[in-house]
Amino acid sequence: MPKTETYPRLLADIGGTNARFGLEVASRQIECIEVLRCEDFESLSDAVRFYLSKHQESLKLCPIYGSFAVATPIMGDFVQMTNNHWTFSIETTRQCLGLERLLVVNDFVAQAFAISTMQENDLAQVGGIKCEINAPKAVLGPGTGLGVSTLIQNSDGSLKVLPGEGGHVSFAPFDDLEILVWQYARSKFNHVSAERFLSGSGLVLIYEALSKRKSMEKVAKLSKAELTPQIISERALNGDYPLCRLTLDTFCSMLGTLAADVALTLGARGGVYLCGGIIPRFIDYFKTSPFRARFETKGRMGAFLASIPVHVVLKKTPGLDGVGIALENYLLHDKI
């Protein structure tokens, strides 16, 4: 078995929109971090080769171990990205890049591994009390899509991550307003999943649905060119666009519903961790948003949920951290 101290290791966190690359030069020490847009490259291998050529001067040795996190289920050697055009064979990619080992995991497996090493300043707590040691931790987060996984820390300190595709569960509206939003989405899609709303494109979809309401006929609206997740959230926070504010409030409420569903399903007394790039953009608003109230609005299970802390992950590159830890575990135990 290869020695675990062999560095550098090639790390990648590949989402629907961006691919983040880094070189782990020593345990938990990642350098040369770079973000590339997936749409700029025909294939994953092209993006990797571009990254390595750009950082050739920093490489004293060529990486022989690689660990990639991808935003799609891993169901064998062939990988097809859910939210971009890349497809690849793990084994062919390993050979093409000259690697001895290439580990490929779901992106939220990497996010979950990263949670295990986070410090207090990497997180912002939103309600709840204290995490229960060794209880399951729920990890989820809206980005280009919606990822969900579970982290379990055993009594001996070893880690186990359970991947899942919880972002694709059927969305259940909570009230009349959300029924209206659901009906709008149902007119466009055969299956209305949680990810349809709890993602960047979901924020736009919620806005479009709410703009059809009679009460919104005379309020200021965004132009087609302005209809992006970033602009919707920015206008929501400046107070001049009631429709944008209602959109963001609805988004946070819906996220509260899903986070509570996941917490109840897993018995996540170890806490709920929200990853992804969307929430940190408006963290101050999020702390006072409808999210926490909705999270606890579960009838007889309200008290159970009230004690569970929710943490927003503030760290910039948790996916790279996590995929490095996943590789470390794999090399030590020959399994994730």
From Swiss-Prot:
What is its subcellular localisation? Cytoplasm
Q: What SUPFAM superfamilies is this protein classified in?
A: Actin-like ATPase domain
Tell me which UniProt keywords the record has, alphabetically: ATP-binding, Cytoplasm, Glycolysis, Kinase, Nucleotide-binding, Transferase
* Keyword Kinase appears in the UniProt entry: yes
GO biological process assignments: glycolytic process
Which molecular function terms from Gene Ontology are attached?
ATP binding; D-glucose binding; glucokinase activity
State the source organism's domain of life. Bacteria
Binding positions for ATP? 12-17
| Reaction(s) catalysed by this chain's protein | D-glucose + ATP = D-glucose 6-phosphate + ADP + H(+)
The answer, when asked if Transferase is one of the entry's keywords, is yes
Cross-referenced Pfam families, in alphabetical order? Glucokinase
One Gene Ontology cellular component annotation held by this UniProt entry: cytosol
Under InterPro entries, the record lists: ATPase_NBD, Bacterial_glucokinase, Glucokinase
Q: What EC designation does it have? A: 2.7.1.2
**Listed NCBIfam families:** glk (TIGR00749), PRK00292.1-3 (NF001416)
Q: Which family does it belong to?
A: Belongs to the bacterial glucokinase family.
Q: Which HAMAP family match?
A: Glucokinase
| Protein name, entry field | Glucokinase
Q: Which organism is it from?
A: Helicobacter acinonychis (strain Sheeba)
Lineage, broadest ranks:
Bacteria, Pseudomonadati, Campylobacterota, Epsilonproteobacteria, Campylobacterales
Per the record, the gene is glk
